[in-house]
């Protein structure tokens, strides 16, 4: 998808202070510490991270050294950056697009789609393919968790609306049709139980028991 090309080596170097330190906290009004807590709450021993960005959240997830973790992204720069950061873990890096069948073997106990859905090509019915693809590689009791920035129907400030419009014009986001209700529907199509809440302009979710 178009937005992933923005993740250059230089951008990844400034990602944590710029995106997590400023945009997430100030523009989207969602505390980064809360997102770290959700990682710690939901992550399990056999974990798949789709769109790991810099590895910031995995680094803080409380996993013991040597824990096997699979990271998946279409951008090799992301995979390289996160792999270097997470050397204390047993990382398997997979270059792949979540909107296509995942080239993975075995099943996972948990998976994260953090900050990914608002970047995927819309509408939400099209993004549902990525959710279904992840659900297909989860164990029967597995959990998918993450967060996504809502479209204009979400609770936005003047500043966040300006940034939402700018990111969609540039093709970094594709979420003008993303609603909390719609997100709940695509999660519910692939999972039996869905928890969904809004913090600032972001929807935070956890979905368990993938449908077979």
Regions found by a protein language model. Name each.
Residues 1-42, 56, 152:
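Conserved class I S-adenosyl-L-methionine
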Residues 46-101:
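Class I SAM-dependent methyltransferase SAM/SAH-binding core
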Residues 61, 133-134:
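Class I S-adenosylmethionine-dependent transferase superfamily signal
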Residues 112-115:
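A conserved beta-strand element that flanks and buttresses the S-adenosyl-L-methionine
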Residues 138-144:
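Short glycine-dipeptide loop
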Residues 145-196:
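C-terminal alpha-helical "lid/dimerization" subdomain adjacent to the S-adenosyl-L-methionine
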Residues 190-212:
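Core SAM-dependent methyltransferase catalytic element
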């Amino acid at each position: 998808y178009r937005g992933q090309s923005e993740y250059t080596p230089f951008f990844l170097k400034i990602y944590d202070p710029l995106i997590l330190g400023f945009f997430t906290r100030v523009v989207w009004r969602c505390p980064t510490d809360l997102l770290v807590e959700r990682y710690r709450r939901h992550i399990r021993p056999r974990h798949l991270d789709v769109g790991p960005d810099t590895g910031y959240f995995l680094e803080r997830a409380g996993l013991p050294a040597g824990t096997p973790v699979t990271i998946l992204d279409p951008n090799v720069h992301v995979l390289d950056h996160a792999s270097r950061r997470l050397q204390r873990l047993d990382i398997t890096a997979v270059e792949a697009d979540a909107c296509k069948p995942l080239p993975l073997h075995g099943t996972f106990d948990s998976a994260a789609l953090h900050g990914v859905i608002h970047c995927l090509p819309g509408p939400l019915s099209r993004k549902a393919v990525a959710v279904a693809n992840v659900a297909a590689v989860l164990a029967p009791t597995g959990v998918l968790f993450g967060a996504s920035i809502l479209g204009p129907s979400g609770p936005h400030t003047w500043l966040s609306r300006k940034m939402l419009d700018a990111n969609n014009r540039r093709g970094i986001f594709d979420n003008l049709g993303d609603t909390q209700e719609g997100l709940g529907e695509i999660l519910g199509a692939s999972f039996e139980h869905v928890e969904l809440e809004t913090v600032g302009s972001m929807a935070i979710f956890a979905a368990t028991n993938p449908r077979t």
